[in-house]
Amino acid sequence: MAEDLFEKLVEIGKRRGFFWPSYEIYGGVAGFYDWGPLGHLLKRRIIEKWRRYFVLMHQDHVVEIETPVIGPEKVYIASGHVEHFTDPIVRCTSCGRTFRADHLVEEALGINAEGLSVSELDRIIRERGLRCPVCQGELGRVETFNLLFRTQIGPYEGSVGYLRPELAQGIFVAFKRVYEAMRSRIPLGIAQVGRVGRNEISPRQALVRLREFTIMEMEYFIDPEDQWGSCPFFHRMADSKLPILTYEAKRRGEEKPESFKLEEAVNEGVVISPCLGYWMAVGMRFVEDLGVPSDSIMFEEKGPEERAHYSSQTFDQLVKVSRWGWIEVAGHSYRGDYDLSRHMKYSGQDLTAFKPYPKPIVVKKRRVVVDKAAIGRALKSRAKTVLEELGRMGEGELERLAASNRAVVAGVELPPGSLRIVEVEEKVSGRRFVPHVVEPSFGTDRNVYVALEYAYREVEGRVVLAFPRDIAPVQAVVLPLVENDEKLVERARMVYETLVEAGFTVYYDDSGSIGRRYARADEIGVPAAVTIDYQTLEDGTVTLRDRDTWRQVRIGADEVVDKLRRFIYDGARLEDLGTPVKP
């Protein structure tokens, strides 16, 4: 049976140093992969490209921070992950193997089981007589499994912590500090790139489903009453095309996306926020710039039963790959005020933003007046506890209490008339609000795999990884025409050192025939080869070879840095850089 593309990439990955299973000498552990020298470079360049698209091009509104990998339990109780971050599992009663229940149902029956409840999955397994795919044993009951990696912080029992499953919570907890440091401006984007962990039940798709991986994520904080004003760069992408498969279209059985202009998608309510739509359009450009054609990208809207607990609307950004079909490479979510409101409630801290009015205005407000003297006289020793509890209450809670016939605080009934609602006039200079959040979140490792797959070519029996030039792990190779000529080697070494000092990632190769060396460079995606030949010794010129066309031009050795920079970063055509070399 012929190798499929995934198997070819796995072979190259191991042999040339892109990636391989972690802990191989101990048999490996599912869901963990190492990035080798070339894979690490490729991943780093993709991260830098993401930073360019999401941070640097929006740096007047977006900043980047770094937060801890481990967080205390109370953070993840507040975020809802302790309660909601679960997947359904089912165990074989014979061999003891554990499977993710919805995936087992999908693979056995060819249906979409995402979002089905535990009881629905259990019913399907019983009614359809599904058995263990490994030993054909009987399957047990479907249960839920929490995907958080649990740990202990310090030597203290009960000090529970979790490895972060996303970068978002570190950003939300740090929001107030960043907001104040950025002079209290909204909109505000806070980006972060870092490692996360999810204790996946049965990861079986190599780099596509890992237990530890890198995320590139941004939380974009906006004023919910000024959605358009919160996206000052919308015009940059207004005419961009978004291929969207809506939830309603999925329910009708449709599988192909419909193309929407960004502005059209927002105005028609397909995307509920211009900010959400804008970052989707940026995400489209980013993935295209990894070498993925637009017809292999789409956005799939998730239904209410499929969305995460914090989301009002979510679109998965999908890319079509050879082995698994459509896979998610990013999630775009409108998280509303869920996260900041939860952290305000559990921490007791004010995480609101303030928007000043053009000039102060006078407004009428209802206020609750607490008669502390009456409470003190009536409750005596218990008054202190009651007053402290009243001090922690918000205005809305106090108003509800004052309006009730029988007000009870800290288990004590308040004396009649001790809480009064009055109407007052106040001069206000602005309004406070809980910012809403739009989140683009990209799985770095999946995007690296996608870049590898779409770069793969076979040309005249040779493998070429035709990466976009600016993400190629190695940018150039320097080659003396022959390895045993001291003068050629000396000049080649000089060119190599010049490129290294100029900041390029470059390697030197003088082993084997020149054709074999070109092939080695093509196989790892090196976009440019600089060859030092006998003409170099005569007139000081070298050849610059294009990986994708195999054509060459002659340029001055003293021009190599400038010409290579234009070729790699500016997308210059080879023919515009020098004099063509006849084949």
UniProtKB/Swiss-Prot annotation:
Q: Which PANTHER family match?
A: GLYCINE--TRNA LIGASE (PTHR10745:SF0), GLYCYL-TRNA SYNTHETASE/DNA POLYMERASE SUBUNIT GAMMA-2 (PTHR10745)
Secretion signal, residue range per the UniProt entry: none
**Gene source species:** Aeropyrum pernix (strain ATCC 700893 / DSM 11879 / JCM 9820 / NBRC 100138 / K1)
Q: Extract the InterPro entries matched here.
A: aa-tRNA-synth_II, aa-tRNA-synth_II/BPL/LPL, Anticodon-bd, Anticodon-bd_dom_sf, Gly-tRNA_synthase/POLG2, Gly_tRNA_ligase_arc, GlyRS-like_core, tRNA-synt_gly
| A GO CC term assigned to this protein in UniProt | cytoplasm
Which Gene3D superfamilies does this chain map to?
3.30.40.230, Anticodon-binding domain, Bira Bifunctional Protein, Domain 2
Catalysis: reaction(s): tRNA(Gly) + glycine + ATP = glycyl-tRNA(Gly) + AMP + diphosphate
Sites where the protein binds substrate: 100, 166, 213-217, 439-443
**Which BP terms does GO give this entry?**
glycyl-tRNA aminoacylation
SUPFAM superfamilies attached to this UniProt entry:
Class II aaRS ABD-related, Class II aaRS and biotin synthetases
Transmembrane parts of this sequence: none
Q: Which UniProt keywords apply?
A: Aminoacyl-tRNA synthetase, ATP-binding, Cytoplasm, Ligase, Nucleotide-binding, Protein biosynthesis
Q: Which GO terms describe its molecular function?
A: ATP binding; glycine-tRNA ligase activity; protein dimerization activity
EC number per UniProt: 6.1.1.14
The molecule here is called: Glycine--tRNA ligase
Q: Where in the cell is it found?
A: Cytoplasm
Classification via Pfam families = HGTP_anticodon
